[in-house]
Amino acid sequence: MATPKAKVSKSRRDKRRAQFTARSKAAETVTCPNCGEPTLPHRACRHCGHYRGRAVTKKSSNS
């Protein structure tokens, strides 16, 4: 297996991780077909609790 030639500092490590998070979160959002709120793909809606047409978490049904 490959081994690192030098220790990666905490600052350099955190800068690399910050770029990944910024790109992945901002680019991919879809609208929930049940309530219309933006949500992450392939996950239950945080506002209404629906996923693929089913209520998977208990939320208020006032949407």
Curated annotation (Swiss-Prot):
Instruction: Give the protein family.
Output: Belongs to the bacterial ribosomal protein bL32 family.
> Out of the domains of life, which is the source?
Bacteria
Q: Where is this region: Disordered?
A: 1-23
One GO biological process term: translation
Q: Keywords on this record? A: Ribonucleoprotein, Ribosomal protein
Specify the signal sequence span. none
Instruction: Return the Basic residues bias intervals.
Output: 7-18
In the UniProt record, the gene name given for this protein reads rpmF
Q: What's one GO-annotated cellular component?
A: large ribosomal subunit
Name of the protein in its database record: Large ribosomal subunit protein bL32
Question: What does the record give under GO molecular function?
Answer: structural constituent of ribosome
